[in-house]
Amino acid sequence: MRIIALPLPNQRVFLHCYPSEYLAKKVTIHDKIINRIYKYWDSWSASKSYTKQKVVSLGNRILHATPYEENFLRAIAPVKKLNDTELHQTLYIEHPPNLESSTILAELNRSKQLQKTHTNYLIGNIIGLPLTIPFILIPLIPNIPGFYLCYRAYCNFRAIQGSIQLARVMSIENIQMQESEKLEKALKLFTNGDATPLNALIGHPDFVDRYKRAVAQEQRKSKIIK
């Protein structure tokens, strides 16, 4: 498993986790279901239906508003596929030299402690689901509140799994910090408006967009504090 750490405003750290090649090959039933949902969502995105386009637009806004901490925990959740021996062989954290290891560890500890928060959110999602039943009785309008609560319940459940796995990873005490000058150079180019090197270095199509959203979220927090 590989974790990329990049600096954010307010002394925070953006953590991006994605599995090793070995972990990626272990396809589960859950993975197959999620892939089908993605394909279904893509078909709605391509549809010319006004209702479907509105639902997709609303859904995308919700996705973009998801806290970056939650995205990290949801990404780390599949680590449960690994046993302890495999975990020892696959985990490391790559970061630019100007980002201190202590700051990264503090962010990891902060993320690990979000389990209770997401548990409370999950309970709220489940309690709210019965309230959306009346929408089912309206045949021309999809039960968007129900779909939303189901989606948020799933997200919070995955975040809980992620926090549990993160605690497990940190208890093993085999987190290896690796400074990367290439990452530092790519980050400098990114701040100057060129995101291509950073995208190419990470090799994940959504990485730069997620990092931009994380920066924007912390900047909004700064404005609120001021």
From Swiss-Prot:
One of its GO terms (biological process) is proton transmembrane transport. It is found in: Membrane. The chain crosses the membrane at residues 121-141. The keyword Membrane applies. GO terms for cellular component: mitochondrial inner membrane; mitochondrion. It is a single-pass membrane protein. Keywords: Membrane, Transmembrane, Transmembrane helix. To yeast YDL183c. This is Uncharacterized protein C23H3.12c. It comes from Schizosaccharomyces pombe (strain 972 / ATCC 24843) (Fission yeast).
